[in-house]
Amino acid sequence: MTFRSALAVCAVAACAAGPLAAQPVLMSPEWAQAACTAWNNDAVLTDQLVETGWVKNDKGRGFKVMHVFRKDCGATPTAEMRIALKGDKALCVYGGKVETAQLDRSADYVMSAETARWVEMGRGDYGPMRAMMFGRLEFVGPKMEAMGNMGPFENFLLLVGKVPGSTQSCPAG
């Protein structure tokens, strides 16, 4: 087989395998959309955040907002998730680009960490308490409310490891 025919065989095999699904960039709007779907498939998040009353602290807007970003990629949030009470579930109703400019610090959250730290938390190397205590996760929001929801909060951090996201580049924005 000549080099040219071997190259043709490889090209045909690659096409037959279908396009490679590119992972969204970690903490990008596309990643947040996938994280929203993963949230809705996690019973700890959808059920326990109703049981504790967390989801009801929405200041009358009908949803809570979470902004997330990778600190080594800039100092502003790159993705937004909105969580709302739908029936008897705390469901993610939006995952995408940051749209909510004004957050309410008594209801909403901003979380940031270096990329490597997000990856560690996503693997379950440590939970939210240790992450915050050692400054690995910066957190703005209702701290007492968060303290009462450490189990669900940990599941949110584990979504980072469950939702595919490339760390080779930073989210655009």
Predicted regions: what they are:
Residues 12-13:
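Short, linear, compositionally biased motifs with a strong N-terminal bias
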Residues 16-19:
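N-terminal signal peptide c-region/cleavage motif recognized by signal peptidases
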Residues 22-173:
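Feature captures hydrophobic
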